Swiss-Prot record:
Biological classification of the source: Bacteria, Pseudomonadati, Pseudomonadota, Gammaproteobacteria, Alteromonadales
Family, similarity comment: Belongs to the class-II aminoacyl-tRNA synthetase family.
Subunit structure: Homodimer.
Region called Catalytic, residue ranges: 243-534
Name of this chain's protein: Threonine--tRNA ligase
Transmembrane spans: none
Organism whose genome encodes this protein: Shewanella halifaxensis (strain HAW-EB4)
Catalytic activity: tRNA(Thr) + L-threonine + ATP = L-threonyl-tRNA(Thr) + AMP + diphosphate + H(+)
Length: 642
């Protein structure tokens, strides 16, 4: 007679084994109708799974985040059901849940078109509308294999052969005539899978290996109700308008081309953005007392072997050879920084030593994963490494945290999620060392009043890590900042310092990044601001326009004055109507549009308007220059107001 303990502490006793659905029905018909799955003793289970012993149970509905993930997973099965009905010759591969949705990889000779995607979505809706029940059957490994062999599902057989032990009992989910295999859980009825949309189709290699066959990957999104789906689709529509690749082309910031995949060709205005961002970070480095260094672009393979990177990253490293020596272009800066640290004897009095670099790194990312500025092969890291004693770890990490938040605040990012990854099973050092390291990070976070989530076992083998994920105006998550303790690399590369007792000790190394890469962060900023950069960051801060040729010399004088003040100004003396000029520069997102006619010229004034169309009226030239210069120096996010 199992006794079921619910989240509120109440208990229910049953005469026979029960399922989550049975318990929900015992509580009330409304909950039974809403029940998607259950969390039994901390483990997600299908609503139909039998509970035989005393257990703690949480009933999962579509109101729960886990419930939405489950219905998304079931929508992947629904997609498979529709695909097999419309394209029976398809071989099904995998269909997992992803952020906000799902996908299914399929092997189909016919290349899916938008018309096919529309037809699949229509068929999915028709199937879901019947509210058919999903039948879960737990079978032997051999029965599962026989089932998929009879259906010609080569990929399902490969999963069984290569990933599932023969003594296991896989779960087969029957969607009417369609059968899929999954660890679950899934919805008990397709009534929960009514609010979805198929988004796109792309190529994907089987098992992510380019040596394998290219499959077609159909993406979809699914939500608990129509309102949530509509909000998501509207957000995607807004994201498409803000796409940094589209805006980058409109504003002539950069381009990429086939001859240099994943490498950025910065144009004048884009490079201005890059340099301004670099300048800002460089000022932060000075504020937080960092040295700035510059290491070589490539180093001998032997060094990468000693550092351990060759074993882990060699597939992602670009290599070359010269005079019978093999070199690797650096994918990261840390080994080079240890080489700089190793030059000359270091004392405990020299620590902490904070070393930063705008390091040009390269990684041979798969071509299919490249995405504008967000995923590139050549990038610049705002990378730093702090060499310190173990006693200094907490204060140094605390300073890193302050620097991260100071930096993000300048760009208007305040919604930051922080996660602390702790010791994995396979790790160096003893538990005492890990206890001290993890406690130092926790204390540093708490000292800065930072709420954080702990990810048990997710740290690197050489030390725990803090990750900073910022959320943009569309509530998209971007993992940018990291603070990683490293107890391994300094020792591998022979870094030591003379301790107070004259013994040689190995320093702790703190890897610190704030932006991650400048390229990716600029992509984030382009989309966050929709190309309307704050004045301090804008490639062109002011454009000065004349009404007639009579004001041309005055316009030249105005622009020259701005440049003397360090303001990035340009002029537009074209023989066009002023309304046309204003519209054009508004579309180019120039923060301030200045118009001068005869009256402004006579009074040494400018007529000021913003790109948002706000008329700030006439100002004395020096007055406006001073106000703008002050706004730029403060790195204000807002434009001047009337």
């Amino acid at each position: 007679m199992p006794v079921i303990t619910l989240p509120d502490g109440s208990k229910r006793e049953f005469a026979n084994p029960v399922s989550t659905l049975d318990v929900a029905a015992d509580i009330g018909p409304g909950l039974a109708k809403a029940c998607i799955a259950g969390r039994v003793n901390g483990e997600l289970k299908d609503a139909c799974d039998i509970i035989e012993t005393d257990s703690e149970l949480s009933i999962i509905t579509a109101k729960d985040e886990e419930g939405v993930e489950i219905l998304r997973h079931s929508c992947a099965h629904l997609l498979g059901h529709a695909i097999k009905q419309l394209f029976p010759e398809t071989k099904m591969a995998i269909g997992p849940v992803i952020d906000n949705g799902f996908y299914y990889d399929i092997d189909l000779d016919h290349k899916l078109t938008q018309e096919d995607i529309d037809a699949l979505e229509k068929r999915m809706a028709a199937l879901a509308k019947t509210n058919y029940a999903v039948d879960k059957r737990v079978v032997s490994w051999q029965e599962a294999r026989d089932t998929f062999e009879a259906r010609g599902e080569d990929y399902k057989m490969a999963i069984l052969d290569e990933n599932i032990p023969k003594d296991s009992t896989p779960a087969l989910y029957h969607h009417e005539e369609y059968i899929d295999m999954c660890r679950g859980p899934h919805v008990p009825n397709m009534k929960f899978c009514q609010n979805f949309k198929l988004m796109s189709v792309a190529g994907a290699y089987w098992r992510g290996n380019s040596d394998n066959k290219m499959l077609q990957r159909v993406y979809g999104t699914a939500w608990a109700d129509k309102k949530a789906l509509k909000v998501h689709l509207n957000r995607l529509e807004e994201a498409a308008k803000r796409d940094h690749r589209k805006i980058g082309k409109q504003l002539d910031l950069y381009h990429m081309q086939e001859e240099a995949p994943g490498m950025v060709f910065w144009h004048n205005d884009g490079w201005s953005l890059f340099l301004e961002l670099e300048k800002f970070i460089r000022q932060k480095l000075g504020q937080y007392t960092y040295q700035e260094v510059k290491g070589p672009l490539m180093m001998d393979r032997v060094l990468w072997e000693r550092s351990g990177h060759w074993d882990k990253y060699s597939d992602a490293m670009f290599t070359t050879s010269s005079e019978n020596r093999e070199y690797a272009i650096k994918p990261m800066n840390c080994p080079g920084h240890v080489q700089i640290f190793n030059q000359g004897l270091k004392s405990y009095r020299d620590l902490p030593l904070r070393m930063a670099e705008f390091g040009c790194c390269h990684r041979n990312e798969p071509s299919g994963s490249l995405h504008g500025l967000m995923r590139v092969r050549g990038f610049t890291q705002d990378d730093a490494h702090i060499f310190c004693t173990e006693e200094q770890v907490q204060q140094e990490v605390s300073a890193c945290i302050r620097m991260v938040y100071d930096t993000y605040a300048t760009f208007g990012f305040s919604n930051i999620v922080v996660k602390l990854s702790t010791r994995p099973e396979k790790r160096i050092g003893d538990d005492d060392m890990w206890d001290r390291a993890e406690e130092a990070l926790k204390k540093a976070l708490k000292a800065n009043d930072i709420e954080f989530e702990i990810l048990p076992g997710e740290g690197a083998f050489y030390g725990p890590k803090i990750e900073f994920t910022l959320h943009d105006c569309l509530d998209r998550a971007w993992q940018c900042g990291t603070v990683q303790l490293d107890y391994a690399l300094p020792g591998r590369l022979g870094a030591t310092y003379v301790a107070e007792d004259n013994s040689r000790q190995t320093p702790v190394m703190i890897h610190r990044a704030i932006l991650g890469s400048l390229e990716r962060f600029l992509g984030i900023l382009i989309e966050e601001y929709a190309g309307k950069f704050p004045a301090w960051l804008s490639p062109v801060q002011v454009v000065v326009m004349n009404i007639t040729d009579k004001q041309s010399d005055y316009v030249d004088n105005v622009v020259n004055l701005f440049k003397e003040h360090g303001i990035r100004a340009t002029k537009d003396l074209r023989n066009e109507k002023i309304g046309f000029k204003i519209r054009e520069h508004t579309l180019r997102r120039v923060p301030y549009l200045l118009v001068v006619g005869d009256q402004e010229m006579e009074n040494n004034e400018v007529a000021v308007r913003t790109r948002e169309g706000v008329d700030l009226g006439k100002m004395q030239l020096e007055e406006f220059a001073t106000k703008l210069k002050n706004q730029i120096s403060l790195r204000s996010l807002n434009l001047l107001e009337d």
